[in-house]
Amino acid sequence: MSEAIKSKTVDYSSDEYLKRVDEYWRAANYISVGQLYLLNNPLLREPLKATDVKVHPIGHWGTIAGQNFIYAHLNRAINKYGLNMFYIEGPGHGGQVMVSNSYLDGTYTETYPKITQDKAGMKRLFKQFSFPGGVASHADPKTPGSIHEGGELGYSILHGAGAVLDNPGLIAATVVGDGESETGPLATSWQVNKFLNPITDGTVLPILNLNGFKISNPTVLSRESHEELEDYFKGLGWDPHFVEGTDPAKMHKIMAEELDKVIEEIHAIRKNAKDNNDESRPKWPMIVFRAPKGWTGPKSWDGEPIEGSFRAHQIPIPVDRNHMEHADKLVDWLKSYKPEELFDENGTLKPEIAAIIPEGQARMAANPVTNGGKLTKDLITPNIDDYALDNKSHGKEDGSDMTELGKYIRDLIELNKDNKNFRGWGPDETLSNKLGAAFEDTKRQWMEPIHEPNDALLAPQGRIIDSMLSEHMDEGMLEAYNLTGRYGFFASYESFLRVVDSMLTQHFKWLRNSHEETPWRADVPSLNVIASSTAFQQDHNGYSHQDPGIISHLAEKKTEYVRAYLPGDANTLIATFDKAIQSKQLINLIIASKHPRPQWFTMDEAKRLVRDGLGVVDWASTDHGEEPDVVFATAGSEPTTESLAAVSILHARFPEMKIRFINVVDLLKLKKDDPRGLSDAEFDAFFTKDKPVIFAYHAYDDLVKTIFFDRHNHNLHVHGYREEGDITTPFDMRVRNELDRFHLVKAALLATPAYAEKGAHVIQEMNSILDKHHDYIRAEGTDIPEVENWKWTALK
């Protein structure tokens, strides 16, 4: 660009400037099509041969030109207004968009020096797309500027919102696919404007890419009229701006005009909020961008429309190395962008076009927020000893684990209030999950009207977002908050974390790929998920609320990037959370009790359990370092309590029985194929090679069975959740699943040859008390006194 255009007097709406924008757009489109089809001859300087074309062109075209158009105009707005902006590519299967644009702006070459901005580099760029050993057809972690892959649809706005929290100068230009808009999470996420503060947070700018079609169907919103769409988005609290058309020349002018209005509207909102301390919810602008699917591509094929049709979705014309009979049509398409006007003899973008591209960190692909690990500040954490319950008399005192954790979280918020890099999320469950102490130092962030005393704990600024009953929203915002370098947690009912288990899978894939395949990405704070109101504490809500399967779901992944913690009491939970919240590049699942329970471990004991992942509990063992008769292993709150009660029964009846009691906190450390897993020798030192192991476990039995399959000791008896539940008493939940103390005693005696016969009378005693339990709860509606009044007695 000329010096005059670089000056402050530039007319960003002039025909000259928009001509350059159009040229840039054409260049991005050319490169995007080239990535689909070409191996060689990237600029078509020679006649196209079969060896120039891929054997299997793979990828998608339908969304590309529209997004490239949007990207080009966002660049223009960045230049005009000096914006701090990054791009989120919501539509599925549009990987070329961010690759092509980061290549044109130089970020791609800076990241991958072999992909040079010339003919040789363009050839490499084209070959690698959707190619073995190359790059994906989505904006995966290898893509500069991406924090959102867009493989599984529905999370674009949520990721934009999580990124702009506590980033008041940042704009997340979030392109939403009209197919994506039909997903549950995306339909929900239009409500994020009720949670973003115009003073302390940045701005999400949704751009609905209304191209009309999905894979083979029309999109719902595209068939609504202009008036219906306007009413719909206004009703959701947005101010929609429309850019609609098919003629590129006209669309450039419309887009420039409307985008200017949008940016000026954003600036006016922010200025008013800051100048007048006005934290009322503004009507943030958004853009409805209606242009044809497959815009600028082939108009038709074999008598049927392509542009403006679902047929533009993938590879629009059938040309590959083995089918070159229509190669001239591919050449016509590529040459329609006039590459000779865009690239010089070396294949480099012409300088007059490159001059309108933002520079340095102003480039969306180079925005520092998209490599958030480099922005991460260390979290300031409290001393966990300050929250220690005494517990020297093991089990003497009752307490709520989550209530105690709430005190730690309260102080974590206070310690990091200046850095503003810690938040919590929940779907209207923070109080229910007993984290109420956190509200001693903060409020729920909420931008809607507040009606006290009917409302409570709401404010325009707060470190907890839990006023939207959407697990998708919580998970999505936390993911982006982490990916942009900040810390947080998401606490929910255990069974309803299954709502987002596919989101957790997608985040796991991002963490793994970014760590293993993109050394230029710095590790980011871990995603911390607290599963409370667990299956065994849902006696009052019943069977629908009882599903502990989230741990099995995560354990199936590469566990180098997953931790599954099952703390047995409050001290262990606090030590676990303190470790998890400071970790990087992991998904930490913490399964935590919220109801009052006996408190077992001193803080020193808890620290050792969390450090080592498991440990022999000396005060609950009678083997004194010798080979035990039976091993009790526990993972979880109720399993620990019930196993200790079982040990006390056995010891009272058979004081000579040698029992080893193991508490497991970090379950996946037992896996042989986990990088942190115990060696066989270490495993055998805990569990022996052949002695019976009574493993009381919080979730489904099969996970523990799978873990032990690769170990020497197969004398395993797992008592977990066996899909038995109802509205009943707390103890009956354990009885139904044979996780209670009486079933555990029976299992231990039957599995230990020396005691199977001489313990027959005790087995009968256990059966009798189980019969009593059955009748008693149905008559009284509460658990038997033997359970309600039980206390741990030190073993002699």
Swiss-Prot record:
MF terms in GO: aldehyde-lyase activity
InterPro entries, per database record: Phosphoketolase (IPR023962), THDP-binding (IPR029061), Transketo_C/PFOR_II (IPR009014), Xul5P/Fru6P_PKetolase (IPR005593), Xul5P/Fru6P_PKetolase_C (IPR018969), Xul5P/Fru6P_PKetolase_CS (IPR019790), Xul5P/Fru6P_PKetolase_N (IPR018970), Xul5P/Fru6P_PKetolase_ThDP_BS (IPR019789)
GO biological-process terms attached to the record: carbohydrate metabolic process
EC number(s) recorded for this UniProt protein: 4.1.2.-
Keyword Lyase: yes
Pfam families hit by this protein: XFP (PF03894), XFP_C (PF09363), XFP_N (PF09364)
Keywords assigned by UniProt, alphabetized: Lyase, Thiamine pyrophosphate
Keyword Lyase: yes
Alphabetized CDD domains for the sequence: TPP_PK (cd02011)
Cofactor: thiamine diphosphate
Family: Belongs to the XFP family.
Protein name (database record): Probable phosphoketolase 2
Species of provenance: Lactiplantibacillus plantarum (strain ATCC BAA-793 / NCIMB 8826 / WCFS1)
